Amino acid sequence: MRAHALAVLPVVLALQGCGFHPLFARAGDDAQGQQIFKTIYVEPIDGERVGYEVRNSLIDLLRGTQKTDSALYRLQVEVKQTIEGVAVQTNASITRYRYTLSATYELADMHDGKTLTKGTETTVSGYDVVASPYATLVAQQDAQRLGAHDIADRIRIDLGVFFAHHG
């Protein structure tokens, strides 16, 4: 065990020496990456339920402000979802669906409206059709919820990379 620790020590010191640091390093809630996220206002998102889910996930992940007067940045997101049957039986009934959620986002300065960064993220999941229509509906909603959280997490990572480089 001691030999393993001694072998890892030079690697850790080398990474520290070259300026490596984790993107979302936490020193409590005072970490710089966490503080900048708190200044982002997430605009309401169209798209019915999934837009609501994406916005709430973004607010939770970013711990963003819900007040436009204290925000430094505005995040606007547009979502598009598609559902297509991927497993079709010989009698033309569908037994599995593919759910695709795409989001295009734009981060802008709240004061002058200048676009700072923008991008697109996509996530794909699937769900089965079962005998119970209610169970199938719940599976679809679960795919939407998981997709919304995944999209929000991907956007958070993109924004973290942007702020790490343009701080």
Segment roles from a protein language model:
Residues 1-8:
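Bacterial N-terminal signal peptides that target proteins for export
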Residues 14-17:
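C-terminal motif of bacterial Sec signal peptides marking the signal peptidase cleavage site
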Residues 19-22:
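Bacterial signal peptide processing site
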Residues 27-47:
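Post-signal peptide N-terminal segment of mature Sec-exported envelope proteins
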Residues 44-67:
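N-terminal leader/targeting helix
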Residues 60, 65-120, 124-142, 146:
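Surface-exposed short loop/turn segments
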Residues 135-167:
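C-terminal/domain-edge helix-coil "capping" segments
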